[in-house]
Amino acid sequence: MAKKGVREKIRLVSSAGTGHFYTTDKNKRNMPGKFEIKKFDPVVRQHVMYKEAKIK
């Protein structure tokens, strides 16, 4: 059986407080810290910061 990969699924939650989120994965070995990126939030129709959260 194949080994489990180093990529972990994460959820990017909008900092605008709209509840909108994106899902993606990241390499835990290359990026051990929390992931932050500016993306488009369709609820407020603006680019806002999205922060990493665990997928429940």
From Swiss-Prot:
Keywords: Ribonucleoprotein, Ribosomal protein
InterPro entries named in the record: Ribosomal_bL33, Ribosomal_bL33_CS, Ribosomal_bL33_sf, Ribosomal_zn-bd
Gene behind this protein: rpmG
CC terms in the record's Gene Ontology section: cytosolic large ribosomal subunit
Listed GO MF terms: structural constituent of ribosome
SUPFAM superfamilies: Zn-binding ribosomal proteins
Coiled coil: none
Pfam families with a match to the protein in the record: Ribosomal_L33 (PF00471)
Source superkingdom: Bacteria
Signal peptide: none
Organism: Vibrio campbellii (strain ATCC BAA-1116)
Protein name: Large ribosomal subunit protein bL33
